């Protein structure tokens, strides 16, 4: 019996702003077994209201998972199934993978804007 693994790479997507400001995304890399859960953290220090989570599958463009227009306000994007988000503060927008599946093997991007 083989063990199937799900791999995701998380890279911050930075937007223009003040010097030394940006989006911080952790962890940078993570490998999960099928069925495991994990949270990708995203924090921004630019006081932006809008925050976004995207995924990019091999050979494809970006797909919006979830977005937020302010603290306490979140909405689904194109591919929300299997994910959850929360936005308790302006700075933080964590993305939770509930039960890792091979179809979620992807590069994940967090972004913010005014």
UniProtKB/Swiss-Prot annotation:
GO cellular component term, pick one: plasma membrane
Protein keywords: Adaptive immunity, Cell membrane, Disulfide bond, Glycoprotein, Immunity, Immunoglobulin domain, Membrane, Receptor, Signal, T cell receptor
Gene Ontology BP term (one): cell surface receptor signaling pathway
Family annotation (SMART domains): IGv
Domain of life: Eukaryota
Principal cellular location given in the protein's record: membrane
Domain Ig-like per the UniProt entry, residue ranges: 22-114
InterPro entries named in the record: Ig-like_dom (IPR007110), Ig-like_dom_sf (IPR036179), Ig-like_fold (IPR013783), Ig_V-set (IPR013106), TCR_beta_variable (IPR050413)
Glycosylation sites: 84
Disulfide bridges in this chain: 42-110
Subunit relationships: Alpha-beta TR is a heterodimer composed of an alpha and beta chain; disulfide-linked. The alpha-beta TR is associated with the transmembrane signaling CD3 coreceptor proteins to form the TR-CD3 (TcR or TCR). The assembly of alpha-beta TR heterodimers with CD3 occurs in the endoplasmic reticulum where a single alpha-beta TR heterodimer associates with one CD3D-CD3E heterodimer, one CD3G-CD3E heterodimer and one CD247 homodimer forming a stable octameric structure. CD3D-CD3E and CD3G-CD3E heterodimers preferentially associate with TR alpha and TR beta chains, respectively.
Protein role: V region of the variable domain of T cell receptor (TR) beta chain that participates in the antigen recognition. Alpha-beta T cell receptors are antigen specific receptors which are essential to the immune response and are present on the cell surface of T lymphocytes. Recognize peptide-major histocompatibility (MH) (pMH) complexes that are displayed by antigen presenting cells (APC), a prerequisite for efficient T cell adaptive immunity against pathogens.
Protein name: T cell receptor beta variable 6-6
Species of origin: Homo sapiens (Human)
This protein's encoding gene: TRBV6-6
């Amino acid at each position: 019996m083989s063990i199937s693994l799900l791999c995701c790479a998380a890279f911050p997507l930075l937007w223009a702003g003040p010097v030394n400001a940006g989006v911080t995304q952790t962890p940078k890399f993570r490998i999960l077994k099928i069925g495991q859960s994990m949270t990708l953290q995203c924090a921004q220090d630019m006081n932006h209201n809008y925050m976004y989570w995207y995924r990019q599958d091999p050979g494809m463009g970006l797909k919006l998972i979830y977005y937020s227009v302010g603290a306490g306000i979140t909405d689904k994007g194109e591919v929300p199934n299997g994910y959850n988000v929360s936005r308790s503060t302006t700075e933080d927008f964590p993305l939770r993978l509930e039960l890792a599946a091979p179809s979620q093997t992807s590069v994940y991007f967090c972004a913010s804007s005014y």
